[in-house]
Amino acid sequence: MLNLCHALRGVRQFSCSVIVKVKCASCSIKLQDQDPSKPGYYTKPKSLPDSKLNPDLQDLKYLLFSQDIQLSKQAIQNDPDLKTKRDLLLRVICKRCSNALHHNNYNPEEFPESTLNDILNYVPRGSNVMHIVPFVEFPLHLDPNVLKRNDLDTTLVLTKSDQVFKDKNAVSKKVPIFMKQFLKNTLRIDSNKTFAISALKNWNISMFYNYFKNYTYLLGNPNVGKSTLINTLLQKYLGYKVKIDSTGKINSPSEEVMQEAFTNPKNFFKIQAAGVSHIPNLTRSVQAYQVGGKILFDLPGYSTSTSRLRLEELIDERWLQRLRKTDLFNRKHIKQKTYESMKGTSQGGCYTVGGIFYLVPPKGSINQIVKYIPGPSKTFKNIEKGIDVFNSCNSSSGTHPLSRYCGIKSVICEKSQYKRYAIPPFIGSIEIVLKDIGYILLRTTGRYEFKGLHEIWIPRGIQVGIREPLENLIESGYQRYIETNGKESSCPRDRPIISSLYEMAPDEADTLNAVKKSYLEKTEKDLSARRFVDDDPYDLVQHLEKKKNPYWYYQW
């Protein structure tokens, strides 16, 4: 741990000689006070703390002054020992994180995205890696490039499973069987190393701990649940941060650190906890943790594209926090599955949550929608009406009667700023998944009759896909697998169960034929995935009971 006797010896004014030995407790970057344009910077206060204070405590007071951390007088005056100084230092966060977390001053340029290759520079060849994927948004976030690497020993960890399943029985027993067969059938990856967990509900955490090896790296996109998982492990196994020197050597934890875990566990965890935030790309450096007898590394999140538009530029800050804060998810939707009804109209009636998307059912169809995305929903006569209303909401400073339904910013002010996607044909129910946002269940009711394709309009830059309803898919597959003693696959082999959507021109009238054309283009280099290519599209959709999920194809 940090040697404060050495770090603070003879220091009367705050300087880099102190702070260089301290990392930001939120993003793990080294702290400095020399260059405002560089990461880890502190803003000097206009006046120094009371010079009558002990010199060492004066430095600590300075550290905490710039980020509004409250210190009790008792801690300053009556407990001036090295342990207190160390604890106070370990709570410090940099100006960037302080502004974003405590002052709602968020500058996306200060939170740059990283690529997979950027992050893999932190990971030695042959390392143990946990690929962290939020199950709630499956298959989005799943990166075959990580699972297929021969230079890493990779395990797939599916987080946030409580947002998909009612209880942990399916998570423990059924998901691993399903995923093993899904990976083999879909990606030709032969692996039985899959865990489904919920850090918030403590589902499978003990099993996960027993499985992962010493010196394991957590790898995934931003906001997939890495830090929440780490904090659950820290609490359960009295874990703590450890430091790495310039040679990569991990310093052994001190007896003093371990003693505090028993004497003051609440304060101990507060200091050691990983920085959990709704803000993406908060972590900027590797942070090592001692969890029981194992070392675990938290890596910064990586993005598959550094050019996509950020959600922070599109979605209202309060709505975005609700979308990203896992602990705010209402599980009653999982248990009750309360639906909203909507009938497709000739005017293009649409369903939206905050203007983040517009779902347009075909004329005459009767639909049920179960919403797993926070925020109130609203229907409009057509997309143009919805966009017009939300423009009025943004210009009214919250006084518009429909302002509570508006979750987007004024930058999305025209229909041209949305992409039009056609959903390939389906029968029954599907789940529409929006990356970093959530999903909705869409169900067509009544006797099947093809009335046209469903459409969804989404702001440019948001990734979307569909899947068969995940919970039902895994439950029914497991039942089939057990009844046949494993002879039949838990994951269907007769049809694709996930698909990308097909972008359409705004004025495209024959969307079904346009979907087939796009399907043939996407599968040009994957001929084995093609199905029903010789069928006439309009004949094909009359027989979906026998020819399920035509033109479904997921582009990894």
From Swiss-Prot:
> Annotated Gene Ontology MF terms?
GTP binding
User: What is a single cellular component term in the Gene Ontology annotation?
Assistant: mitochondrion
Q: Which Pfam families match?
A: MMR_HSR1
Concerning Gene3D superfamilies, the annotation shows: P-loop containing nucleotide triphosphate hydrolases
User: Which InterPro entries does the UniProt record give?
Assistant: G_CP_dom (IPR030378), GTP-bd (IPR006073), Mito_lipid_metab_GTPase (IPR050896), P-loop_NTPase (IPR027417)
Where it sits in the cell: the answer is: Mitochondrion
CDD domains on file: YqeH
Question: Out of the domains of life, which is the source?
Answer: Eukaryota
Write out the entry's keywords from A to Z: Mitochondrion, Transit peptide
Q: Residue ranges of the CP-type G domain?
A: 113-305
Task: Give the transit peptide, as a residue range.
Answer: 1-21
**What is the role of this chain?**
Interacts genetically with prohibitins and thus may be involved in the mitochondrial lipid metabolism.
Spell out the family assignment given in the record's similarity comment: Belongs to the TRAFAC class YlqF/YawG GTPase family. GEP3 subfamily.
Q: What is this protein called?
A: Genetic interactor of prohibitins 3, mitochondrial
Taxonomic source organism: Saccharomyces cerevisiae (strain YJM789) (Baker's yeast)
Q: What's the gene?
A: GEP3
